[in-house]
Amino acid sequence: MLPQKRGRIPSRIAMSCYWKVLAIFSLSLPSALSFQPAQPRVLLVSFDGFRWDYIYKVSTPNFHDAMENGVHVKQVTNVFVTKTYPNHYTMVTGLYAESHGIVANEMHDPILNETFSLNKMDVYNSKFWEEASPIWVTNQREGHKTGAAMWPGTDVKIHGVFPTYFMPYNESVSFEDRVARLIHWFTSEEPINFGLLYWEQPDEMGHILGPENPLMGPIISDIDKKLGYLMSELKKAKLWDVINVIITSDHGMSQSSSERLIELDQYLNRELYKVIDHSPAVAILPKEGKLDEVYEALANAHPNMTVYKKEQIPDRLHYKHNSRIQPILAVADKGWEIVYNRSDSFQFGNHGYDNILPEMHPIFLAVGPAFRKNVTKEVMNATDLYPLLCHLLGINPLPNNGSFNAVKDILAEEFPVALGGDTYATVIGVFLGSFLVMVFTAVFLKHFVLTHANTMQMQHTEAAQPLLQD
């Protein structure tokens, strides 16, 4: 028997056990971390023309349920002009209209010598959209997937990119079918992390009836039911508790009257100019050499119409630094309409007025795990939505006119602005895993040192015994 070898067996066994346990732990750690929640998911919903105060005009239980379980912003200052295409593009770029280039629903680009019109196929001309890059382009370039159900611009190839999945615009497609498609995209084997949903109402009926018409009540109630349907379908798909939903609009609506018409024919010969975009913010292109003549004829023509040369447009409107903004802009006061004459078609509701007017402001609700509950915020700018969306998605925002700091107070807790592909669960999981490895290593080393020390003591004792026996 060799006493000096007695301590080696325990140390070898301990070392063998250590490496086995460490190997098992290392193999199991990725599996444990894989149970983290899925990537952040966001659904952006726009009910076109849903004015901020519609929720108080009739019973809207589903809107109020979202308010109680999320965030409600009372006044959202959208961008001028307060029309559909400029504001929908602002929401997904964070830019003023003069910066993103979609300056109106109807446009003429003097550099391209081309027009853009909602009533023609011109809206699919990529050149009009590429002064900015919408959020779905960034989202996909950072490795994620986007799904869009009729959102303006999502069926246009912008910078060579379509959304991963999209529905070509077709007004006849029902709200329910749009929701079903989005649910499918969110729950597929390769799911989207960002969805966009657009619905044409209550804008269409708001134009026909006017926002103050009692007949708008059933229209608003129907929108509330559609929101309830969306919430129900998200719950059925087990998405409601994990998805962040933002419910908003592009603009509000103002009541018009046939008694409040400004007739251009009373002041100016039509041969001198062309109207590019229509009431209540009228973009006027004078014939060559007629700029001053047209301006002077209109400048003081009517007390309820303000006329600007392009360079005179107030800075607060952020609406003069783009070639698609016409040389003259005529803006009607709230409730007034600018027409050629009384034979023109007339609508009882309209938008496009100064964005300082509360009647032009849209609804804004946000509900989901990222948001505080039952919180009311007084004001925000529509441009702030884009950096908020980028934050929620964990992607890096492009330069924009918004401010994340202006809206971060609606979030449930602070997160880094851009986490890339990593979620907080990943960060926490890696930290805890590393910590456990360190603790395990420390405990083992302590055990190993103590065992080794005991072995040395045993060796020393047995080596000394023959001398004692002598």
Regions found by a protein language model. Name each.
Residues Y273-T376, M380-L388, H452-A464, L468-D470:
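Active-site neighborhoods of enzymes that stabilize oxyanions during catalysis
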Residues V242, S249-G289, G421-T423:
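Acidic/histidine-rich catalytic neighborhood
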Residues P37, S172-T187, N193-G195, P202-I243, ...:
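A long, amphipathic alpha-helix that forms part
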Residues L44, N62, D222-E263, A330:
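Metal-dependent active-site segment of extracytoplasmic phospho-/sulfohydrolases and closely related
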Residues C17-Y18, T82, G94-P211, P303, ...:
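His/Asp/Glu-rich, glycine-adjacent segments
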Residues C17-L33:
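Cleavable N-terminal signal peptides of Sec/SRP-targeted secreted and luminal proteins
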Residues W52-H100:
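Short, structured active-site-proximal loop/turn typified by the sulfatase FGly-forming signature C/S-X-P-X-R
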